[in-house]
Amino acid sequence: MRLSSRFYLFTSFTAWSVVIAGATPAVCGAPEYIIETQNDLDVLSNCQVVNGSIIMNTSSATSLNFNRIETITGDLIIRNNNYLASVALTSISSVGGELRFEKLTRLASVYAPQLANVGQLTMRILPNLQGIRFDKGIKKAHKLTIEDTQLSTLAGISLNTTDTMVIVNNNYLREVDMPYLESVESKFYVSYNAREISVTLPRLKTVGDMTIQRVAHLQLSNLEEVKGFLGFLNSTLQDISCPNITRIGQSLFFIGNQELTSLNFKQLESIGGTFMIANSAALAQIKGYDKLKTVAGSIDFTGNFSSVELPKLRDVKGGLNIQTTSSDFTCPFRQSDGIIKGKSFVCRGSVDNPRQSKESSFDDDDFDELLGNGTIKGSKNSTSPVKQSGAAKVDSRPFRLVTFFLVLVSGFAHLL
């Protein structure tokens, strides 16, 4: 074991010399402990509290047991090991910094029955991880990232609030059930997990940015405010119901939801960016926005719908593009009524090939730079089969480009 600071209380040879007989808890203090083997870890077996971080970066260990340690005030990071099959955090109840498991190709199980609080939980590129045991339940984590695992459930992760939640490229994950989650301050992304995945967030009230991609079942009945953008992409949802949302700070978009037949946003009053619906062939009517008054960006609807009902809409600061194949469509807007403030005004039916606005085309690299790895398309380092699938690439690319436009235009709507 190596200590990374010149100032420390003990070395690997005398770790127990500072433990005073009968004193509880036994506290070990050094900014960072670098471990490579179970023997290195055993040196800390008399420490109940580690005031610092424990890091394993490359190792050939096949299993790790953290024995008597109960609290780590810094980070616990285990990564870059092709042999490690199991990790037991038997007594650990709290990790003040980040708990990270990353690039552990054989890791099959994580056992942490007492763990309740972490600063940040990251589980990335663990292609054989099928089991996690968080028996007590993780109730606090500022950031949660679950990416490229074989987990089928996130049972044992039961947050009340968090800053960021990213759950992507877990091909066996069939449910994201967070019954007590009430707020996500920054980002909530669920993308490219099992096709039949169910996302249940019955108490969620506020969120920053939210992207729901390739989801089969969704529960957002209590959602009241989205501070950033809200997007539903490539899902098999038949009904999307957010009956209590009153405000969306940036864009709202529905793209590639081929089985979608109904929308319910009956309390929504304002959208701070673009409002887009595209590639949703089963959506025959666009309605369910009884109180929508203002759209700070543009309206861009394309599809097969026969009607658009926005009865309270009075102000669209951007342009209008409504194109449908239906011959029964009658445009609900007139350029002379003053509702549409932008320069572009397209609103017609019987269109053979409805097209989105020209502004929807952006370079794919620009999109990746904006949203980063592991949000819509997954991480560059991901081993997930989804990333390698040609079908997935063909299916998702145009929608990723459109999403870039939506996020960008929400900040520049006044220029349209």
Curated annotation (Swiss-Prot):
Key words of the record:
Cell wall, Cytoplasm, Glycoprotein, Meiosis, Secreted, Signal, Sporulation
Give the positions annotated as glycosylation sites. N51, N57, N160, N234, N244, N304, N373, N381
Please tell me one Gene Ontology term that the record gives under cellular component: cytoplasm
Q: What is its main location?
A: cytoplasm
According to the record, the signal peptide region is 1-29
For this entry, list what GO says about its biological process: ascospore wall biogenesis
Q: Where's it found, cell-wise?
A: Cytoplasm; Secreted, Cell wall; Spore wall
Superkingdom of origin organism: Eukaryota
InterPro entries in UniProt? CWI-Assembly_Regulator, Rcpt_L-dom_sf
Q: Does the keyword Signal apply?
A: yes
Functionally, this protein is described as follows: Required for the formation of the mature spore wall, where it is needed to ensure correct localization of 1,3-beta-glucan.
Protein's UniProt name: Meiotic expression up-regulated protein 10
Question: Lineage of this protein's species?
Answer: Eukaryota, Fungi, Dikarya, Ascomycota, Taphrinomycotina
